[in-house]
């Protein structure tokens, strides 16, 4: 999928290109393109983490009468909350880059997107340990 930018340049919005990092040598100049690349990395890294946690919960609670349903609900709510936060923080990072007049390399988008998921994990575990 391609979108037309305000300066009549083409913005690449291909999920396959973002996830495979095909865009070596190119830079992300547009706010939409920066946001999209950062958000997709945050989305798929969060999906991986929540998928692994969901499988673990499902296996550990398979004999529990309501455990399977509770694990699906918990993973769904956690995933939706992290994706909502990723939308906002990805837009903030892209906006800061755009206002500063900087371009973003595709690898920087990877670092920002996966970094959001790692930071979410660290904050989540620190909150759980504080309640024990």
From Swiss-Prot:
Topology in membrane: Multi-pass membrane protein
GO annotations of cellular component type: plasma membrane
UniProt keyword annotations, A-Z: Cell membrane, Glycoprotein, Membrane, Transmembrane, Transmembrane helix
Membrane-side (Extracellular) residue stretches: 1-37, 90-104
Oligomeric form and interacting partners: Interacts with CTNNB1.
Record's subcellular location: Cell membrane
PANTHER family per UniProt: SD17342P (PTHR22779), TRANSMEMBRANE PROTEIN 170B (PTHR22779:SF4)
Residue stretches spanning the membrane: 38-58, 69-89, 105-125
Protein known as: Transmembrane protein 170B
Main location (coarse class): membrane
InterPro entries (UniProt xref): Transmembrane_pr_170 (IPR019334)
Pfam family, one: Tmemb_170
Family label: Belongs to the TMEM170 family.
Biological-process GO terms, alphabetical: negative regulation of canonical Wnt signaling pathway
Membrane-side (Cytoplasmic) residue stretches: 59-68, 126-132
Chain positions carrying an annotated carbohydrate: 12
